[in-house]
Regions:
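Single, function-defining residue in the core of a domain
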Residues: 3-165
């Protein structure tokens, strides 16, 4: 039926989230759901590989999700750009632009999952790229084993994910 001069058809819509190897573009795992399911809901059903680093965009920043991600598989880590309004306190300064941080867990998150506690920890790094300071947050706490420039370079591979669709 025309509506405002346009024809509309009923079409099923779905939301998908995939775990992709950025080197090979191979889809490792995928979840498909209705559009009323959020990306975090679908992503929490993915199975990360052991001894892996998953690159997320900022939409996946959630204490409950990221803590859970690390528990899904042995040495399953994550790396993402830090939000501009990130609330944290410095636990340890590894270098001028590399920090072990502690972040408060929101009241809402604690209500949904009381096992989370009051705080969670991660690593915050700052890297200058094209004249701008970029901040990244990661579960890879060991600054000697995972140098900050190597992590920033690794995150640049996140755009390879877009080549899979």
């Amino acid at each position: 039926m025309p509506l405002g001069g346009h024809f509309y058809t009923a079409a099923n819509k779905v939301r998908a989230t995939c775990l992709v190897n950025t080197a090979t573009h191979e889809i490792i795992d995928a979840q498909i759901g209705s559009t009323d399911q959020g990306e975090l809901t679908l992503a929490s059903q993915l199975s990360p590989c052991s001894h892996s680093i998953t690159l997320f965009d900022r939409a996946y920043f959630s204490a409950d999700f990221l803590i859970g991600w690390q528990k899904c598989a042995e040495e399953s880590h994550w790396l993402m750009r830090a939000k501009d309004n990130l609330r944290y306190e410095i636990v340890k300064r590894n270098s001028q632009h590399d920090f072990h941080i502690r972040m408060p867990i929101s009241t809402r998150a604690k209500k949904l999952n009381p096992a989370l506690g009051d705080y969670w920890e991660a690593r915050l790094i700052e890297v200058e790229q094209a004249g701008k300071i970029r901040r990244y947050i990661t579960s890879l706490i060991d600054s000697k084993r995972y140098p900050l420039l190597a992590l920033a370079k690794l995150y640049a591979q996140r755009w390879e994910i877009e080549m899979c669709y």
